[in-house]
Design a protein with these regions (language model features):
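Active-site-proximal loop motif in hydrolases
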Residues: 41-64, 74-109, 118-132, 186, ...
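Flexible, small-residue-rich helix->loop connector segments that border functional cores
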Residues: 57-67, 94-115, 139-147, 209, ...
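Hydrolase catalytic cores
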Residues: 96-100, 118-124, 139, 150, ...
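Short, solvent-exposed loop/turn elements at domain surfaces
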Residues: 1, 63-70, 86, 127-128, ...
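Protease zymogen maturation seam
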Residues: 2-53, 61, 66-69, 274-290
Length: 290
């Protein structure tokens, strides 16, 4: 195959995961009173995201969660192609709520409140999938997303050139991409897709309350562009519930929501960045409703 002029390269189809969250609180019942999570408040508050679209390449999304505006018609399941892109894990639903949970007096509210979230299911109920599934998902978004849309990618693995190239191809479409730096407390340059640099691509490290570096977060600038809240983040979860998770998986959606609204700026730098070059803390340049 490698000698075929029509074949760019041959690579093993490796396993990818979203990276284990540092903490998982017991899911809460559906429809508790709405709160504004500390992460949303720290990046400048929430704004109206109605009419804007975020593509969630993850474990799927709870398709009938009362706090999410899910567009399953554009969604796709690359794990089981005959099935709906529903979330049997919870991770993708959690990321979706950080981005776009509705301002509707229940549960939580996202950075771009009420934004449309599209489920691209590439990870299974255990939070893992193959690079071929993920690349297929990225290519699908590239073919269907519009300029100004945003994409969240809260997963990763070792260095893998084909996925890096797929992301560069997607970014060339004018789509803005938020990528989790990873939870291995190592140099993010050792991880794909976190290591990808380019126009419209933002790799995100994680912090805790008090602007303190999250000990699990990957580092190095480049490729990291911004730091965002990632520890003890409350958001939507599977089966219509809510939960608290920690990880760079939670940091990236904060930036995805900001990108969906428009421009991103910074408000100080994170404290304790191990690479000695503190990452700027992401903040929305859009006037907040709260």
């Amino acid at each position: 195959l490698q000698g075929n002029e029509n074949v760019v390269g041959v690579y093993p189809d490796m396993i990818v995961t979203y990276g284990l969250p540092v903490a998982l609180a017991k899911p809460t019942p559906s429809q508790p009173a709405e709160i504004t999570p500390w992460g949303v408040a720290r990046i400048g508050g929430f704004s109206d995201g109605t009419g804007k679209t975020a593509w969630i390449i993850d474990t799927g999304i709870d398709l009938d969660h009362p706090d999410l505006n899910v567009d399953q018609t554009r969604g796709k399941n690359f794990v089981l192609k005959s099935a709906l892109p529903d979330d049997d894990n919870g991770h993708g639903t959690h990321c979706s709520g950080i981005i776009g949970a509705m301002d509707n007096n229940i549960g939580t509210v996202g950075v771009a409140a009420g934004a449309t979230v599209v489920p691209i299911k590439v990870l299974n109920r255990k939070g893992s999938g193959t690079y071929s599934q993920i690349i297929a998902g990225i290519d699908y978004v590239a073919a269907n997303a519009k300029t100004g849309d945003a994409v969240n990618m809260s997963f990763g693995g070792g260095v893998y050139d084909p996925i890096d190239q797929a992301i560069l191809n997607l970014s060339a479409k004018g789509v803005k991409i938020a990528i989790a730096a990873g939870n291995e407390a190592q140099d993010a340059n050792n991880c794909s897709p976190a290591r990808v640099n380019g126009t419209n691509i933002y790799t995100v490290s994680a912090m805790a309350k008090g602007d303190l570096w999250a000990s699990y977060s990957n580092f190095s600038n480049p490729p990291v562009d911004y730091c965002a809240p990632g520890s003890s983040i409350y958001s939507t979860y599977k089966n219509g519930s809510y939960a608290t998770l920690s990880g760079t998986s939670m940091a990236a959606p904060h930036v995805c929501g900001i990108l969906l609204l428009g421009s991103i700026t910074s408000d100080g730098t994170v404290i304790g960045d191990p690479d000695g070059n503190p990452d700027p803390i992401a903040e929305s340049a859009t006037t907040a409703l709260y």
